[in-house]
């Protein structure tokens, strides 16, 4: 890759589109505004939780890199962020998560019923804004991705024996739940570009999303909690099997395999159980394997950029690859 990870920040990546990202936040607030006081309260909370706007950033950068001058780019970026927020709200409700971005989740602060309805509301607002564009192409792309994410979530819920989850199923899940929205954001950013550039943007987003998700799953094994100094192991506590564990399961000796099974059979695994499984995964090469897979997808993303013309926006997209695989959270 062209730059060292230590030299790439999100601010660097967003610099070519920073002014329009502020407008995206304003457009999102306008888009989800509601008259009902309860919905207004939830919206205020959601806007305070505003994340990194990474997906809108990718959309605006691919729009810049493709050089199409599409005046709808900011609105499309806000639509993508609304859909992303909807998925987070629904995911937190399904997982009974307490915190998101260091703040209480909607289901914690309000209720599970409110979180389900608000997720639906954000989806419906996105659909309304798409319809107002009077163009079927972004509707086709975004309806396809929302369907993929929904099926992916159901596929995860339907995995009755988590320890039978293999790498093919894992990649299918990552592609549907994460990479699909990355790919859609990048494709929509290049909607008015030449077909080859639109395809390149979509391929870039897909590969970047895969690298991003694998890195996210790695962080669950490597990120230290401030108090204990041990890996957080949040996914393991929730009995979620991700690539680092998948990579070693088939070759673990029977006694160590039984330790993993004991954790997954425990309704509430304790910190020592989690720490022990994390050590087993690391000692047997699971973290290294996952890093290698993330790096492979990063190379795919970088190769896709070769079909976009040289520009500062394309450079920022290249930096986004480094950021995705080297970030701490």
Question: What residue spans do the PLM features occupy?
Answer:
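All-alpha prenyltransferase/terpene-synthase fold signal
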Residues: 1-329
């Amino acid at each position: 890759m062209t730059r060292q990870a230590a030299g790439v920040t999100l601010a660097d990546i967003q610099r070519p589109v920073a002014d329009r990202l502020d407008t995206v936040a304003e457009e999102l607030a306008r888009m989800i505004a509601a008259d009902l006081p309860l919905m207004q309260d939830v919206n205020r909370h959601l806007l305070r939780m505003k994340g990194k706007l990474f997906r809108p950033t990718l959309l605006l950068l691919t729009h810049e890199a493709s050089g199409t001058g599409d005046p709808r780019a900011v609105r499309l970026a806000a639509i993508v962020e609304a859909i992303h927020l909807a998925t987070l709200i629904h995911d937190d409700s399904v997982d009974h998560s307490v915190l998101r971005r260091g703040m209480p989740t909607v289901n914690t602060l309000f209720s599970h019923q409110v979180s389900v309805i608000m997720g639906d509301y954000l989806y419906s607002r996105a659909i309304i804004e798409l319809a107002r564009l009077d163009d079927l192409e972004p509707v086709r792309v975004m309806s396809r991705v929302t369907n993929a994410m929904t099926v992916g979530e159901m596929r995860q819920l339907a995995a009755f024996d988590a320890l039978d989850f293999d790498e093919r199923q894992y990649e299918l899940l990552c592609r549907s739940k994460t990479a699909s929205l990355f790919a859609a954001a990048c494709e929509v950013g290049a909607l008015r570009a030449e077909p080859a550039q639109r395809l390149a943007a979509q391929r870039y987003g897909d590969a970047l999303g895969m690298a991003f998700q694998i890195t996210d799953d790695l962080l669950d094994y490597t990120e230290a909690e401030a108090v204990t100094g041990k890996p957080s192991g949040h996914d393991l506590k929730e009995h979620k099997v991700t690539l680092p564990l998948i990579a070693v399961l088939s070759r673990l000796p029977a006694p160590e395999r039984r330790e993993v099974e004991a954790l997954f059979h425990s309704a509430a695994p304790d910190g020592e159980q989690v720490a022990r499984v994390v050590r087993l995964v690391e000692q047997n090469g699971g973290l290294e394997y996952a890093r290698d897979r993330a790096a492979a997808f990063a190379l795919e993303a970088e190769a896709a950029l070769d079909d976009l013309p040289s520009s500062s926006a394309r450079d920022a997209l290249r930096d986004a690859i480094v950021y995705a695989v080297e970030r701490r959270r």
